[in-house]
Amino acid sequence: MDSPCTSESIYNLIPSDLKEPPQHPRYTSLFRATIKNDMKKFKTAMKTMGPAKVEIPSPKDFLKKHSKEKTLPPKKKFNRCSPKKPAVPLRTDHPVMGIQSGKNFINTNAADVIMGVAKKPKPIYVDKRTGDKHDLETSGLFPKYINKKDYGITPEYICKRNEDVKKAQEEYDNYIQENLKKAAMKRLSDEEREAVLQGLKKNWEEVHKEFQSLSVFIDSVPKKIRKQKLEKEMKQLEHDISVIEKHKIIYIANK
């Protein structure tokens, strides 16, 4: 059995120089150049700290004497041929006083008030005891729209739009009929369309039932391939069902 003092040695008493571990390399961001370019876009010279990027003045444009002083505008020549303004009245001139009109303003104003149409008060309603007033027309309490002459009648623009849709459908049907003769296309009837739709839904239910019966753990390649195949079939069936449900009129080509 080893003694407990085997690790002790006299050489351990010799002082040794402690070596500092080397420093890790300084972190440098990979986006440093991108950030610098972005900062240069939004910064302007003479507005932020740092060396201002201004144009170096030319030695020829040195500062001259009186170059900073404001210059007077050019002197305009007085034109004596322009028309003169009327003279200022003298102090001795007095305006004509005592001119009166024969119009009776009192009777005229009274007649205007009597013959004028009385101002109708604005219809309002009060919903609180403190006198909170609101407009009656815009409140919805007054039957305004149901009393109109055209209430309940289909607007003209909707009738026009329906006619345009009907006309476009007729033109499309005529175009399809022409192509039917050329390409021998066949239109699916409502019964055939419903039968195809029900068949697709039935196929989807069968594939979905088979998909639900898969094991929880997919731990082999064949299981994974089978699961992907079932998912692809279900996705294709869902796409076909949505297309048939969305389009009421379907044409097929006779091969």
From Swiss-Prot:
Superkingdom, taxonomy of origin: Eukaryota
Organism: Mus musculus
Stretches the record annotates as Interaction with TRPC proteins: 160-255
Residues covered by the Enkurin domain: 160-252
Entry keyword set: Calmodulin-binding, Cell projection, Cilium, Cytoplasm, Cytoskeleton, Flagellum, SH3-binding
Protein name, per record: Enkurin
Annotated region (Disordered), positions in chain: 1-25, 67-96
UniProt note on tissues of expression: High expression in testis and vomeronasal organ and lower expression in ovary, heart, lung, and brain. Not expressed in other tissues.
Binding partners and assembly: Microtubule inner protein component of sperm flagellar doublet microtubules. Binds calmodulin via its IQ domain. Interacts with TRPC1, TRPC2, TRPC5, but not TRPC3. Interacts with CFAP45.
A Pfam cross-reference name: Enkurin
Motif (SH3-binding): 83-89
Biased composition (Basic residues): 73-83
Record keyword Nucleotide-binding present: no
Keyword Repeat attached: no
InterPro entries: Enkurin_dom, Enkurin_domain-protein
